[in-house]
From Swiss-Prot:
Its cofactor is Fe cation. NCBIfam families: DMQ_monoox_COQ7 (NF033656). Catalyzes the hydroxylation of 2-nonaprenyl-3-methyl-6-methoxy-1,4-benzoquinol during ubiquinone biosynthesis. This is 3-demethoxyubiquinol 3-hydroxylase. Fe cation 1 binds at E55, E85, H88, E169. Its EC number is 1.14.99.60.
Length: 206
């Protein structure tokens, strides 16, 4: 038990503080840097910081859910989603650096809250565990579509990253649904949306 706790603690430290790794090529590989105005660059940077913080939250959420999941298929779905979210961390972290910015200072806070939420979701049972996975991914997909609508058209590098992330999130949601996710009650969806809005507004600037 102690070994497992140490492993999970190490995962948390790596997620928040260590450079993330990716097996897949970066989606923006081979694309040229666009000539962005200072305003466009600041906006793209803010959006990529939001996306990076969102992936930190997703890592913590899925880590907590996997800890308490009972069904092996559910655990595997969560682990697969978590690994691809790690790749998203690597992609967004690199893009943030290219745009001359830094990651959100609030990442440790959001990680802790998301981990607690994931553990709670897992304790409710696998169907609700999967419901949280499905709804989280659909909400992330929606906000990535919003980002694609406001990112500068000429910022091909950021747009390629966000597009691949969106496609991955959609696939994760479909997997959760196919595995038997429960129907998430509207009030819970609303609370998740409000929490997401708070994360986006704060991490865009801080």
């Amino acid at each position: 038990m102690l070994d497992k706790l140490i492993i999970e603690f190490d995962k948390g430290l790596r997620t928040v503080f260590a450079p993330a790794q990716t097996l897949r090529p970066h989606p923006d590989t081979g694309l040229e840097e666009a000539g962005l105005s200072d305003l466009e660059k600041r906006h793209a940077l803010g959006l990529m910081r939001v996306n990076h913080c969102g992936e930190v939250c997703a890592q913590a959420l899925y880590q907590g859910q996997a800890l308490t999941a009972r069904d092996p298929a559910t655990r595997e779905a969560l682990k697969e989603a978590a690994w691809e979210e790690t790749e998203h961390l690597a992609w967004t972290e690199k893009r943030i650096a290219e745009l001359g910015g830094r990651k959100s200072l609030l990442n440790p806070l959001w990680y802790g809250g998301s981990l607690a939420m994931g553990i709670t979701a897992g304790l409710l049972g696998d169907r609700w565990n999967l419901a949280f996975l499905e709804e989280t991914e659909y909400q992330v997909e929606a906000h990535l579509n919003e980002h694609l609508a406001t990112l500068p058209e000429q910022d091909a590098k950021s747009r390629a990253i966000v597009t691949q992330m969106r496609d991955d999130e959609h696939r994760h949601a479909e997997t959760a649904h196919a595995l038997g996710a429960a129907a998430m009650p509207a009030p819970v969806k609303g609370l998740m949306h409000l929490t997401s809005q708070l994360m986006k507004k704060t991490s865009y600037h801080i």
